[in-house]
Amino acid sequence: MELLCCEVDPVRRAVPDRNLLEDRVLQNLLTIEERYLPQCSYFKCVQKDIQPYMRRMVATWMLEVCEEQKCEEEVFPLAMNYLDRFLAGVPTPKTHLQLLGAVCMFLASKLKETIPLTAEKLCIYTDNSVKPQELLEWELVVLGKLKWNLAAVTPHDFIEHILRKLPQQKEKLSLIRKHAQTFIALCATDFKFAMYPPSMIATGSVGAAICGLQQDDEVNTLTCDALTELLAKITHTDVDCLKACQEQIEALLLNSLQQFRQEQHNAGSKSVEDPDQATTPTDVRDVDL
């Protein structure tokens, strides 16, 4: 008799606690969220060696690592929060940027994952340009500069608070959530969103997700303007600011899709058997505008 071990243990999750979705929790998140934002636009006043395109490159690499390791959705935005806060206070040579990104993923996965990423695995993703001991030493450096304040508020903390207040059918919420999570990951790769309050990014992402799905009449129960006003009311956000944020998110998605299609076109001669490389955030190709 042949025995096959095909069982895959599902991720064990706690039962949703309604107490964590009460208005007082949302208000507390709104009160403290700006404590964890970068204090300045560090490319102008702190970093002399690192340019915005370098941040975008390391962010894309970090996102691909998180996707391949099937990390929780919160890990990547949280890691980018650590990276931006560190760079806002510490001049860093560009040769250490990938090391910093690996350390930030290491810390974020410890906070959000049941089984966190290991130092050895992260070093493999750097093509062994970083050694495990070096990563562990830098872990202490980053922790010290962040003053051990790791429980940062991210856009994901607001998603469930927002969704439960929307007049949407429950069976549609999972699709809206999935698209909103994609937008949040996309925003984390672009520095212009680094100093936006997480609540605004979350609200804009949900709004962009629903408006992008408006071809489905069952999803679109409100006009986009009415939806924006409702979302702004939920998170106490200025309507005009929210509209501007949502437009920037949609423009970022469009640019990402165009870039992906261009890369596909350039790789037209590539063998069909070659694996598809992650060049765009999770499920971006499935999002409609």
From Swiss-Prot:
Major site of localization recorded for this protein: nucleus
Positions of modified residues (Phosphoserine): S271
Gene Ontology biological-process annotations: adult locomotory behavior; cell division; cellular response to X-ray; G1/S transition of mitotic cell cycle; long-term memory; negative regulation of apoptotic process; positive regulation of cell population proliferation; positive regulation of G1/S transition of mitotic cell cycle
One annotated GO molecular function: cyclin-dependent protein serine/threonine kinase activator activity
Modification after translation, per record: Phosphorylation at Thr-280 by MAP kinases is required for ubiquitination and degradation by the DCX(AMBRA1) complex. Ubiquitinated by the DCX(AMBRA1) complex during the transition from G1 to S cell phase, leading to its degradation: ubiquitination is dependent on Thr-280 phosphorylation. The DCX(AMBRA1) complex represents the major regulator of CCND2 stability during the G1/S transition. Polyubiquitinated by the SCF(FBXL2) complex, leading to proteasomal degradation.
Entry-linked InterPro entries: Cyclin, Cyclin-like_dom, Cyclin-like_sf, Cyclin_C-dom, Cyclin_N, Cyclins_cyclin-box
Record PTM Phosphothreonine, positions in chain: T280
Top-rank lineage group of the source organism: Eukaryota
Domain (Cyclin N-terminal): residue spans on this chain: 26-151
Residue ranges of the region described as Disordered: 264-289
GO CC annotations, alphabetized: chromatin; cyclin D2-CDK4 complex; cytosol; nuclear membrane; nucleolus; nucleoplasm; nucleus
Sequence similarity: Belongs to the cyclin family. Cyclin D subfamily.
Quaternary context: Interacts with either CDK4 or CDK6 protein kinase to form a serine/threonine kinase holoenzyme complex. The cyclin subunit imparts substrate specificity to the complex.
Function per UniProt: Regulatory component of the cyclin D2-CDK4 (DC) complex that phosphorylates and inhibits members of the retinoblastoma (RB) protein family including RB1 and regulates the cell-cycle during G(1)/S transition. Phosphorylation of RB1 allows dissociation of the transcription factor E2F from the RB/E2F complex and the subsequent transcription of E2F target genes which are responsible for the progression through the G(1) phase. Hypophosphorylates RB1 in early G(1) phase. Cyclin D-CDK4 complexes are major integrators of various mitogenenic and antimitogenic signals.
PANTHER family reported for this sequence: CYCLINS
Name listed for the protein in its UniProt record: G1/S-specific cyclin-D2
Native organism: Mus musculus (Mouse)
Biological classification of the source: Eukaryota, Metazoa, Chordata, Craniata, Vertebrata
Name of encoding gene: Ccnd2
